[in-house]
């Protein structure tokens, strides 16, 4: 299962819950004679389970209008910018910015880079030197073995365990790269956990409980839950290539505009790691018999969470890729996938690869399966409410009408003005009310002037 985070981690797309502060150093020398702000050497530190801290020694020599920190991670199009309280002139200060894991989960093996930007009152903008830190899972004493592309890290099991995992990983990368016509040169880190709790802690609280492996293409890292005695199990030789295929897929389609549908990514990973097996085929056929097939446009983003629907989504995905290869050939599949690197839409990619848009491809896939497209389910108009007596059917849409003169004999819904007699009666009532109010006020004032003073009052 890939973890595709647009622009790198949720906190870069939303609000960062982080602390930003300025520490003024007491007892240091007064204002510097230099005309420009003085940036000291920036530092960055990380503590697993807590977060990342950036510090920048800084001595302003004039009024500072704004201080910002620019944070980037692998895969981002641009930096995340956060304002930090500007120090007053002209004492040495240490600017501080924290990314807290308690507020937004930080994935291990992520490198955070920060650079400080200061804007003076006159509009002059100055940049400090960038600094970076790798956020690592330091709970274990990791062992490492490396191949041409893959670096395996594990803490439980002998050296043979790591080497076996390396062989599986290198083959998975090589097979996917050959199919998609890409060359992988950047290293891929493969972290193996033997403890379930530690594994899920590393991936974060949003991880589904049925996940045994997860690839993070932005940091070119794969995490897997494999115990030493499971390394030769059949599922290991399936899960590892599956997840690593996602990393190669990302290399083939990488662009800042549009990512391919989820079913194509997962379907290709299943197709390469195990194929359209009898078990997947059986799941799809059962869904067809029960009219429970999920259209491909319902599998473009997240897959269903219930167990049966979750596995059906994978079965349908590999079924669609299998149909694509059987009908149009592997070269068409590769052309389709590689076209995404240009940032095209799904229809444009499919048209470039197989000569048909997505809807036409889906119709052909369903026909090949002997299935019918399910009825679309989505927002529907609410039921009509109770109607007034004498009404029938849906009421007409009301139109706004300004009141105006009405022809003689024509009824009007506009309010009618009171007659002259009514106006006189209303006027008398108003006068009477005013007289009563005046009399009441006079009586209250007289009562106050004749009351005896209390014991504490002065005569």
Identify what each model region corresponds to.
Residues 426-459:
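C-terminal membrane-anchoring or membrane-association module
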Residues 405-435:
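Extracellular Ser/Thr-rich, low-complexity/disordered mucin-like segments
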Residues 141-261, 290, 303, 313, ...:
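Juxtacatalytic substrate-recognition/specificity segment
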Residues 1-8:
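N-terminal secretory signal peptides that target proteins for export/translocation
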Residues 30-139:
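Beta-strand-enriched, solvent-exposed domains that form extended recognition/catalytic surfaces
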Residues 13-27:
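Bacterial N-terminal signal peptides
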Residues 209-222, 234-239, 244, 251-394, ...:
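Acidic/His/Gly-enriched intrinsically disordered linker/tail segments
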